[in-house]
UniProtKB/Swiss-Prot annotation:
A GO MF label: deaminase activity
Gene: yjgH
Protein's name according to its UniProt entry: RutC family protein YjgH
Database matches in InterPro entries: RutC-like_sf, YjgF/YER057c/UK114, YjgH-like
Origin: domain of life: Bacteria
Paired cysteines (S-S): none
GO CC terms: cytosol
Similarity annotation: Belongs to the RutC family.
Amino acid sequence: MVERTAVFPAGRHSLYAEHRYSAAIRSGDLLFVSGQVGSREDGTPEPDFQQQVRLAFDNLHATLAAAGCTFDDIIDVTSFHTDPENQFEDIMTVKNEIFSAPPYPNWTAVGVTWLAGFDFEIKVIARIPEQ
């Protein structure tokens, strides 16, 4: 049986303790990262939308790094958006900076009506590189 191990970034934000969940779970050579939002250190949403997206990717980067991964190790992405039509351009600006060369990860974008005060959330599955 494959062991599951919780992974947390350095300087993790208060949402993990408050809502009792792991930033990511390592299972074998896969890393399942919980939805990352654009929260400030106190767990509150960043009000500027593009900055919120950037913070979500910063939080994702920190979680990946805690498991020895980078954005290049991501194989599957699911993102959640409260207003996809009006947010698309800002999201694509940040996405294209981070995933600038193929092969790109799979990506599913989902429009939602509620993200607990946030407007963007991103969860991923990554393959953990061999040590």
